[in-house]
């Protein structure tokens, strides 16, 4: 995935953790971004995303979920911003962000980790809420509305 030329949702934790230099190097093309094509956790999360959306719809009995990813863009103070959300709950104009994590992780940890990304997406999409739908290992699913 091309990561140059804009600030995206995945960059929010890097910014919040203060690793500005590495982000700047990647965004300006001075350094390649990490190759995640052989990262099992990343690939598994991508592969199970549609299943996660379907489970969310089934559990919450929602039929108005746009299943395809939605991209939002903005130019803010001359800085291109872009966010690709996993899905949208149309009736609420809410974002759905799907994650797949290890079994012993907690929703509290996931909220802490992904809150910057979710807030960024909500701002870009001009949405007041975001569902975080998380599969923990292969035994548990939880969802919260932020």
State what each model feature region is.
Residues 42, 58-146:
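Nucleic-acid nuclease catalytic cores
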Residues 1-54, 59:
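Charged, glycine-rich intrinsically disordered N-terminal tails and low-complexity linkers that flank
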């Amino acid at each position: 995935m091309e990561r140059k030329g804009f600030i995206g949702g995945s960059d929010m934790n890097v910014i919040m953790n203060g690793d500005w230099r590495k982000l700047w190097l990647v965004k300006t093309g001075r350094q390649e971004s990490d190759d995640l094509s052989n990262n099992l956790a990343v690939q598994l999360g991508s592969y199970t995303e549609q299943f996660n959306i379907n489970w969310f719809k089934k559990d919450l009995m929602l039929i108005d979920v746009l299943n395809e990813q939605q991209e939002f863009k903005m130019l803010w103070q001359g800085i291109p911003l872009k966010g690709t959300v996993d899905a949208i709950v149309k009736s609420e104009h809410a974002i759905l962000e799907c994650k797949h994590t290890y079994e012993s992780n907690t929703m509290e940890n996931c909220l802490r980790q992904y809150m910057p990304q979710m807030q960024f997406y909500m701002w870009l999409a001009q949405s007041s809420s975001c569902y975080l739908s998380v599969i923990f290992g292969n035994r548990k699913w939880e969802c919260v509305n932020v």
